[in-house]
Regions:
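N-terminal accessory regions of nucleic-acid-interacting proteins
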Residues: 1-115, 126-182, 239
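Metal-dependent phosphoesterase core characteristic of DEDDh/y 3'-5' exonuclease domains
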Residues: 3, 92, 115-121, 126-322, ...
Length: 327
């Protein structure tokens, strides 16, 4: 994917999607100095244009993935979100999550993802980094049954209150095996021409890696990150990590928090669906990414420091992920 001039309506574009990624997130203070001109504040946006969310079930999954395969060439920027039944394993009460090292965070993540089932995957597609999403798909999976599978009750109640019909998932949902096969053959994964945008993405990618592998997650964090790189490439942008870079560089503390808070701070409105549904959140993630990139990463190459970094699982250059807690 060629690079383009950045600024104004054009926006940034990943400069070398095919190049070997070298983590550089720890160097961002060298890229954002006190002399750098402050970006304009967020401005109110007009109501977003309505976007249809395409619901994907077992009876139409083949047809919908044909549309996905056809869309990738025109819309190679993909925002992704997942829904799953919460978390059931936590750090000891005396240990705050923020004090865990990346490896300890991954061990906790692995224990949850290995034990639980994916419920929904949302995918939103855009033509360029500055374009609104053109297509959105919500893939509904069938494996999870709250009557027999472990889950966090509060999380499942929240999903139900947000319109997720778990009975319909069990009756009409796509099997994880079928989803994995279609995802592998779709051109979405193992494709260096696709760029991925997420928000606080460690669990999202972990569930997709588990589904694609068809088994439990790798034992160690570096091996897991290698699988993420193989399946999803180097052009992976976690908006929560971007927000932390912007906060550290510009003092924008309003950008710290969950997706709804960050979107609100940027005055980005939800364009489709309801919160806590995967496709709607993937669309909101993309629109939040667009506005954050416009305001805080306007120069060509300025987002390179964020590429390939999953929030909370950051590995410093030459580090071993066992000694440094995440910020």
């Amino acid at each position: 994917m060629p690079s383009v001039e950045v600024g104004g309506a054009g926006g940034w574009r990943p400069k070398h999607l095919h190049q070997q990624y070298q983590p550089k997130h720890h160097q961002y203070h060298h890229h954002y100095t006190q002399q750098q001109q402050q970006q304009p504040p967020p401005h109110p946006h007009p109501p977003p244009q309505p976007l249809e969310i395409r619901e994907v079930w077992a009876d139409n999954v083949e047809r919908e993935f044909k549309l996905i395969r056809a869309a990738i060439e025109r819309f190679p920027y993909v925002s992704m979100d997942t829904e799953f039944p919460g978390v059931i394993h936590h750090p000891p009460p005396s240990v705050h999550h923020s004090t865990l090292t990346p490896s300890q965070r991954y061990t906790l993540l692995k224990s949850n993802v290995d034990a639980l089932h994916l419920i929904q995957v949302g995918l939103a597609f855009a033509a360029s980094p500055s374009s609104p999403p053109a297509l959105a798909f919500q893939i509904n999976l069938r494996e999870f049954d709250p009557r027999v599978h472990r889950h966090a009750p509060d999380s499942v109640r929240l999903l139900a209150a947000s319109g997720v019909d778990l009975a319909a998932h069990r009756a009409r949902g796509v099997s994880a095996r079928a989803f994995a096969a279609l995802l592998m053959s779709s051109g979405l994964v193992c494709n260096p021409g696709v760029a991925w945008v997420t928000f606080c993405s460690a669990y999202d990618f972990a569930y997709l890696v588990k589904v694609l592998m068809g088994r439990k997650l790798p034992r160690a964090l570096p091996e897991f990150l290698r699988y993420v790189r193989v399946y999803f490439g180097a052009a992976v942008y976690d908006v929560k990590h971007m927000a932390r870079v912007a906060c550290d560089s510009y003092g924008e503390v309003a950008l710290l928090g969950g997706l709804e808070r960050v979107a609100g701070a940027l005055r980005v409105r939800r364009a489709a669906g309801r919160g806590h549904q995967a496709a709607s959140d993937s669309v909101l993630t993309w629109d939040t990414f667009r506005e954050m990139a416009r305001l805080y990463f306007p120069k060509e190459g300025s987002l390179d420091v964020c590429a390939g970094v999953l929030y909370g699982l950051e590995l410093p250059d030459g580090g071993d992920a066992t000694t440094k807690p995440a910020k």
